Amino acid sequence: MHLFPNTRIFVSFGSLEIAWYAVLILTGALCAYLLCQRTMKKWGYAPEVLDDYVVPMLFIGILGARAWYVIFEWNYYSSHLNEIVAIWNGGLAIHGGLIAGFIFSLYFFKKRKISFLRMFDLIMPTVLLAQAFGRWGNFMNQEAYGGIVSESFYTHYPAFIKNQMFIDGAYRMPTFLFESVCNLLGFLFITFIFRKYWYKRRGDCGFMYMVWYGITRFVIEGLRTDSLMVLGLRTAQLVSLALMVVGCLGLMGVFHKAFHWKKKPVVLFDLDGTLIDSQQLVFETF
């Protein structure tokens, strides 16, 4: 067994190698899972609900992220078909994973008759935490970097970051680090500040994720030099714009009623026994 044989490999057992990329992605996913599981227990959900969700969700998310990357790099992969499955070498586009995961989540929670918006609130902030870990996988693979910078740019950075960002004979801007930090700040903001002071209705934390990550990725993508392109445009920036728009509309309540798949009559009794038809009030509030 060889631990840390090089910057890309975490551990090797003979010909079997486990990449840092995989370890960091799974570490992020595990942290997100544990946080979600703790909250779901507080909400009274059976723990097996999340257990049944997370494994297929992780698989589908990675599959969607890889498919998105391969589609927009088809000029290369059409001649290297055997490399399509080589995700340990990098090449996962988060937007593809988000789209695939969103579709699966709609199906899963509707089938289980669980509020999608409530799960949206629960899961999406933790996705930012998982993404913060995942960007360090890009660091180990020397990808998701920006333009050429001078050596003095790294004066106040740790040596291991400076050394790893020396790519193709030049120092590169560590855009992976910028996004990782922004994702971590987004997780903390949504979880501890937004939820406490600005949360109005179910789904708001999920929609805030879309706004936060949309802005973060749009800005940082403009600094990168290895972006996926379509018709001369950066695909990540186009999708990020869509995320921002949908997120803002969601925070305004535009999609709220669409996710109440089956409205049930809701009534409240006042203390004096008066029956109050409060269905509209409850749906507008929660």
Region locations from a protein language model:
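A feature for loop-to-transmembrane-helix boundaries and adjacent hydrophobic helices
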Residues: 1-263
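Active-site neighborhood of HAD-like aspartate-dependent phosphohydrolases
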Residues: 264-286
